[in-house]
Amino acid sequence: MAKEQYNADSITVLEGLEAVRKRPGMYIGGVGSKGLNHLIYEIVDNAVDEHLAGYCTEIEVYLEKDGSATIEDNGRGIPVGMHEKGMSAERLVFTTLHAGGKFDDSAYKTSGGLHGVGSSVVNALSTWLDVQVMREGKIHHDRYERGVPMLELEDGLLPVLGKTKKTGTRIQFLPDPEIFEKTWFSATELKSRLHETAYLNPELTIHFEDRRGEETEKLTY
């Protein structure tokens, strides 16, 4: 039943994103190292919500050479169907504060992160953010720059890159140096948080890679 309920209609819209870039500390606690890493935690926590709902078993977290971070899960994929607001539900999740499945009680009984709220905050505080949603046999794609959508919707829906048998969501983003004091993620803090998350969720596997050095560090929790 829950699988059918988690769709475009599960996204509830409350307000816009304007305040996030002006007062980021209200949403992520600050613009230092902890606030920077908090961007990753928000996306990971959304994937953990999928795990708690019974769908996601693996999360991959990569720190890329260009300073960006990639988070991928094998959950159901963010809803991409047409929302009553006239656009893809994914677009609402990433551009509207407080648009997320968490605010519709039918989709999740438990919720770890801001869920949806977190996605839009990460988007607003990133130089760019790229989304791929694997859902219903297709790879749906979207891209943003400082929170602004860069791709034109086709009849309100996302462009499709191709077909896939996988399900899940892949998000890659580059933190905005106009917002943060520094944009170099702390691998030590991140590894500690991922280890704790995996410990609290025994059936969840988390893969971590730090690709920024000469040799890639790989860990599985």
Where are these regions (language model features)?
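Conserved ATP-binding N-box helix of the HATPase_c
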Residues: 34-57, 118-125
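Conserved helix-loop functional segments at active or binding sites
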Residues: 19-22, 26, 49, 53, ...
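Short, surface-exposed helix-loop/turn micro-motifs enriched in polar/charged residues
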Residues: 28-31, 35-36, 51, 106-109, ...
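Bergerat-fold GHKL ATPase/HATPase_c domain
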Residues: 1-44, 48, 92-94
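A conserved short beta-strand within the histidine kinase catalytic ATPase domain
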Residues: 57-63
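Long, structured ligand/cofactor-binding scaffold of large enzymes
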Residues: 47, 52, 64-66, 71-73
